[in-house]
Amino acid sequence: MHPRRPEGFDGLGYRGGVRDDPAFGGPFHARSFGSGTELGHWVTTPPDIPGSRNLHWGEKSPSYGVPSAPPTLEGSAEEPFPGGGEGPRPGPSSEQLNRFAGFGIGLASLFTENVLAHPCIVLRRQCQVNYHARHYHLTPFSIINIMYSFNKTQGPRALWKGMGSTFIVQGVTLGAEGIISEFTPLPREVSHKLNPKQIGEHLLLKCLTYMVAMPFYSASLIETVQSEIIRDNTGILECVKEGIGRVIGLGVPHSKRLLPLFSLIFPTVLHGVLHYIISSIIQKIVLLILKRKTYNSHLAESTSPMQNMLDAYFPELIANFAASLCSDVILYPLETVLHRLHIQGTRTIIDNTDLGYEVLPINTQYEGMRDCINTIKQEEGVFGFYKGFGAVIIQYTLHATILQITKMIYSTLLQNSI
């Protein structure tokens, strides 16, 4: 139920004000919002698509009517490029290509995270909730084999089911966070100064957001694991309907083993908050390392304009990739427990991940999170928490490949334009 990437590329960072980064020896000026007469207090600036408009390190998109000062890599205005001397400045056509290519890089990353990776998410969730399975699919080879079987017996729709509901859950999560922060003093972002009170309020906002999105996440989970063989042609808003019905106790009848929503609050919020914290920390560390590495390379030798443009875009994407990978791997056992608790008692029929051409019912009787953990450990062993882990390997291998291909295409375009 968390977004596939943390909000913003500053992790727990603060976008406003002036930030001093010792790695670059100078302040980075954030975007200016203008005077209160130009923009109302209710207007907020949406986050930039990664790599779309940030032309240099630390530079954010300028607001309407406010000119932006050209940033420098060092404090001296006479030496915009490290090592002395002035590098070639891109012309208007080069700048347009720079913006267009950066926007394309961001869209390619978002497309990979939310569309191309969806079959891996479907298989991963089906393996996690299948307590009958004898094959755990810990490697990508067995996952590819079962993907082929599902596609052969049920068609391509078997691997793309529930994709619309995942976008709805992300929209509900972002919308709930914005509304709650608008009507409460809880901050959506925190400053770089470690203020325990501000961090606590920010995490409280995350907890409330995950609580609001929880019933819709549960409905989306059912759509992604329900077998296509017995699945009805549901509309794209079925996730919203089922989520509201879960809250008010209406909709599709469930069994007596269905866990009440209040018993799902703790594991759901715990998973969401831990995923956000781990992602933010990893992202911050990786981005800092890449910034220092880039800065040292600029000091050692003069770099080309093409390399400067690549250094402006890809560190954020790489940091986001590493953050998502680490958080998914670390929290995979907790995610398995969470999905089994959400799916219990919903009368869901899933595909047989051992054979690929049969269906199985979900008839678990967990009493809660602790009972679920103990039962998995006793009946399926420690590796039972990692069922379907091969899908994670395929998902992030595909993501890394798309990033590398995008970087190669972008480098070729820049070489032809310079």
From Swiss-Prot:
Its main location: mitochondrion. One of its GO terms (molecular function) is protein-containing complex binding. The keyword Disulfide bond does not apply. It comes from the Eukaryota. It is found in: Mitochondrion outer membrane. The modification Phosphothreonine is found at residue 45. Transmembrane protein of the mitochondrial outer membrane that controls mitochondrial organization. May regulate the assembly of the MICOS (mitochondrial contact site and cristae organizing system) complex which is essential to the biogenesis and dynamics of mitochondrial cristae, the inwards folds of the inner mitochondrial membrane. Through its interaction with the EMC (endoplasmic reticulum membrane protein complex), could regulate mitochondrial lipid homeostasis and thereby mitochondrial fission. This is Mitochondrial outer membrane protein SLC25A46. It comes from Mus musculus (Mouse). The gene is Slc25a46.
